[in-house]
């Protein structure tokens, strides 16, 4: 079977052969893979495919395999957040997005590797070991949804789901040369997502083309009463697949370029922006002055929420349990021995930020900065349809390069965390290369204006070939 199939390609293969044969081909690719992108595959995948062939399962994604990040609950299929503390945990229910995918006929083919509890930018903190970037096996795939991006880039799944708390869909999409969308906060239900930071994260799709992103969003998007942050606003993503950006007003934030940005990355992004000008869009620079405070505010908020969210993992109900003479000793030993170093670091920092005497100084100040960052976006979208910037300031770095310096990893999230603070949607699309490694163009839209993102990204794809580049070649 040919690798790197789109949804429409998969449907053609199914029509020519069968859903069972297509699913079996993907399972064979996964079995032979050397990138460590999956944590497990689904025993029920072939059964679902057979049901599609019999006409017992139908829908817009009938028979299409999809890979799921390991922090999204899948009934009967292990969901561990790539952490020892959830070893062996099998959810008794499906996340809302999984319910939607199954209703649409999709085949859940397996779970993908990730940074432990979605805390990281490299997938190096996984208890299953690092996922390798398909473009260069000595480099990271990005994170925290590194497995989800890598398996799509390697042709081991046509589409995947990740989660994005501060860039965790867009970063690996950029590093692996695929398309990744972070929807507006509230546009996709978080029911069944094992939370890192509730007020920041969203589930989003990854694929080799914008068309597939739109198709998946039309399935998983929409209101869910079980998620109190879910907003009842219907968006027709596929209707926005229009190759026309004439009159599109693009804002280019000064603060997302310059010092710290790799020159090859910056050149590729400017080439992309100039391409839009050739396509009759217009661009203008814009200042977003509070960007310089966003990173500190983001990590203060995210770690504070993490310290609260992860308090529930203590070995009492699931996962490994260490012996102790009482509950406190048992829980303390269990957490100390089964949470990884990065997760422990973030829990400690978050607990400190929320502690008596420091909450006003750090956490509440961070919330005030969050409002200022959102106001920057509000002002920008009063004049522009979309904003454009590099997704990441540099291409994929080498495995182990930043492990001993966590602050350096935090800093490279500088271009992605502001959108999570503001809750606005954004998409990363391949726009070229730097030293033979993929570069992502980040397109940012106003709240619930995913249509503008998809239209802009789709038009770029139709007029360039960057999204067609595959590991082993450069567009």
Curated annotation (Swiss-Prot):
GO CC term, one of those recorded: glutamyl-tRNA(Gln) amidotransferase complex
Pfam families, per the entry: Amidase (PF01425)
Record keyword RNA-binding present: no
This enzyme's EC code(s): 6.3.5.7
Recorded GO MF terms: ATP binding; glutaminyl-tRNA synthase (glutamine-hydrolyzing) activity
Top enzyme class: ligase
One GO term (biological process): translation
Reaction(s) catalysed by this chain's protein: L-glutamyl-tRNA(Gln) + L-glutamine + ATP + H2O = L-glutaminyl-tRNA(Gln) + L-glutamate + ADP + phosphate + H(+)
Similarity section: Belongs to the amidase family. GatA subfamily.
Protein name as it appears in the record: Glutamyl-tRNA(Gln) amidotransferase subunit A
Naturally occurring in which organism (per UniProt): Methanococcoides burtonii (strain DSM 6242 / NBRC 107633 / OCM 468 / ACE-M)
């Amino acid at each position: 079977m040919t690798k790197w199939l789109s949804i429409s390609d998969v449907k053609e293969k199914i029509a020519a052969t069968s859903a069972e044969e297509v699913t079996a081909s993907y399972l064979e690719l996964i079995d032979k893979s050397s990138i460590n992108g999956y944590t497990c595959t689904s025993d029920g995948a072939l059964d679902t495919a057979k049901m599609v062939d019999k006409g017992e399962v139908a829908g817009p994604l009938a028979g299409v395999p999809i890979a799921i990040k390991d922090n999204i609950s899948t009934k009967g299929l292990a969901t561990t957040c790539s952490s020892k503390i959830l070893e062996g945990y099998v959810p008794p229910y499906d996340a809302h997005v999984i319910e939607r995918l199954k209703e649409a006929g999709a085949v859940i083919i397996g779970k993908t590797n990730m940074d432990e509890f979605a805390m990281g930018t490299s997938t190096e903190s996984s208890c299953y070991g690092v996922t390798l970037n398909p473009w260069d096996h000595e480099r990271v795939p990005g994170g925290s949804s590194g497995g989800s991006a890598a398996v799509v880039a390697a042709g081991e799944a046509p589409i995947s789901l990740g989660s994005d708390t501060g860039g965790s869909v867009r970063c690996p999409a950029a590093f692996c040369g695929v398309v990744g969308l972070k929807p507006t906060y509230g546009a996709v239900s978080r029911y069944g997502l094992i939370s890192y930071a509730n007020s920041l994260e969203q589930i989003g799709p990854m694929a080799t083309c914008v068309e597939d992103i739109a198709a998946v969003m039309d399935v998983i998007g929409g209101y869910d009463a079980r998620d109190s942050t879910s907003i009842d606003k219907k968006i027709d993503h596929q209707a926005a697949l229009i190759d026309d950006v004439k009159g599109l007003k693009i804002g280019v934030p000064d603060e997302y370029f310059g010092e710290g940005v790799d020159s090859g990355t910056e050149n590729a992004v400017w080439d992309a922006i100039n391409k839009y000008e050739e396509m009759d869009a217009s661009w203008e620079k814009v200042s977003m002055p509070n960007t310089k405070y966003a990173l500190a505010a983001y990590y203060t908020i995210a770690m504070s929420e993490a310290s609260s969210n992860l308090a529930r993992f203590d070995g009492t109900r699931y996962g490994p349990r260490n012996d102790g003479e009482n509950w406190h000793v048992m829980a303390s030993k269990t957490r100390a021995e089964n949470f990884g170093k990065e997760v422990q670091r973030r829990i400690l920092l978050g607990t400190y930020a929320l502690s008596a005497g420091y909450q006003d100084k750090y956490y509440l100040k961070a919330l005030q900065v969050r409002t200022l960052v959102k106001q920057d976006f509000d002002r920008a979208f009063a004049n522009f349809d979309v904003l454009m910037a590099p997704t990441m300031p540099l291409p994929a770095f080498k495995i182990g390069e930043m492990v001993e310096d966590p602050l350096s990893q935090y800093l490279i999230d500088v271009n992605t965390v502001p959108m999570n603070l503001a809750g606005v949607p954004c998409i990363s699309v391949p726009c070229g290369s730097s030293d033979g490694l993929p570069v992502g163009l980040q397109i940012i839209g106003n709240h619930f204006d995913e249509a503008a993102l998809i239209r802009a990204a789709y038009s770029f794809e139709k007029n360039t070939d960057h999204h067609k580049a595959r590991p082993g070649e450069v567009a």
